[in-house]
Amino acid sequence: MLLGGRPLHLLVLGVMGAYAGLGAYYATVARLPHPVVYAALPLGEDAAGGAPDWEAFNATAIYVAPNETDALSPALRDRARVVYARRDCRAYLWDVHFRLAAVAWLLYAAFVYARQERRMFGPFRDPAEFLTPEKYTLNYAASVLAATVIGCSYTKFAWYMAELATRRAALSRDLREDPITLAHRHPTLIALILLELGLRLGARMALFTTLGVTRAPCALVFPLYARALVWIFVLAVGALELLAATLPHIARVSGATATPARSDGGRAALGVCGACCSTVLAGIFAKALYLCLLVGGVLLFLHYERHITIFG
């Protein structure tokens, strides 16, 4: 059923899968000189109540636990750093980054499947989203088995699909004209639509949270190209999602304004073109604002992640 999804959604799913696969590959083969980072303070500053900060391994320093400082000789005390927390960054790649990328892929795959099912059987405000139910897998399988095994034509399933298409058209009309009454009469239907939207939102949030690898303490030991690839993949998915959200709206506006533009002359065409552009730009701005708010929320969480890791 996934193969019938919109091409942009399938492309997003492919990019997410490549992102998760590349993350797993890097976590397996990455050659990190020292994959552990430490939240440490120089000896003496810990007694003054200083706040520890994350740092990469320093071969000239001596890392000790807070309860081991008394055993140090005076010659080593200048090189001693008191460790309050540490993190294995290779394990971080597997336990946090890869899991988030895999969860994002699974949620988006579930969204694509749910949307595909709704395009066949469920309501849409835009009829252009409809897929013919005759392409349903069970309908095709029933007709093929009847023709090859039994040697006859089987049309009952096709009739049932046609009835579903009629029912879908009626529900879509109610969704456009009176969504509140539709929600009251068919709460399960609205719940399934909200579940579909929730799957997509959850996939986006999980994907954007993977940006934590560029700001987490482990970013100190990851090379620049690895952090750049994370941003490239996430921004590519964000751009494709923005494109998938705006292209249907552009097509609807273009289709609605095509006839007046041809019949009213140059002035009408200019007015329609201006209205079309303003509507499209407003939609793009709204989607971009939503994307910025989502990224901002994730980055705000990552800003406090260091303190949560050290003191929580």
Curated annotation (Swiss-Prot):
Localization (cell): Host cell membrane; Host endosome membrane; Host Golgi apparatus membrane
Keyword Cell membrane: no
Keywords in alphabetical order: Glycoprotein, Host cell membrane, Host endosome, Host Golgi apparatus, Host membrane, Membrane, Signal, Syncytium formation induced by viral infection, Transmembrane, Transmembrane helix, Viral primary envelope fusion with host outer nuclear membrane, Viral release from host cell
Subunit description: Interacts (via UL20 interaction region) with protein UL20 homolog (via N-terminus); this interaction probably plays a role in the coordinate transport of protein UL20 homolog and gK to the trans-Golgi network (TGN), and is required for the cell surface expression of gK.
Pfam families associated with the record: Fusion_gly_K
Lineage top rank: taxon: Viruses
Glycan-bearing residues: 58, 67
Listed transmembrane segments: 92-112, 188-208, 228-248, 281-301
Coiled-coil positions: none
Membrane-side (Cytoplasmic) residue stretches: 113-187, 249-280
Keyword Magnesium included in the entry's annotation: no
Taxonomic path: Viruses, Duplodnaviria, Heunggongvirae, Peploviricota, Herviviricetes
GO cellular component: host cell endosome membrane; host cell Golgi membrane; host cell plasma membrane; membrane
UniProt record similarity statement: Belongs to the alphaherpesvirinae glycoprotein K family.
Signal peptide: 1-20
Protein name: Envelope glycoprotein K
Known role: Glycoprotein that probably modulates membrane fusion events during secondary envelopment of cytoplasmic capsids that bud into specific trans-Golgi network (TGN)-derived membranes.
Post-translational modifications reported in the UniProt record: N-glycosylated.
Stretches in topological domain Extracellular: 21-91, 209-227, 302-312
Main location: host cell
One Gene Ontology term from the biological process aspect of the record: fusion of viral membrane with host outer nuclear membrane
Topology of this chain in the membrane: Multi-pass membrane protein
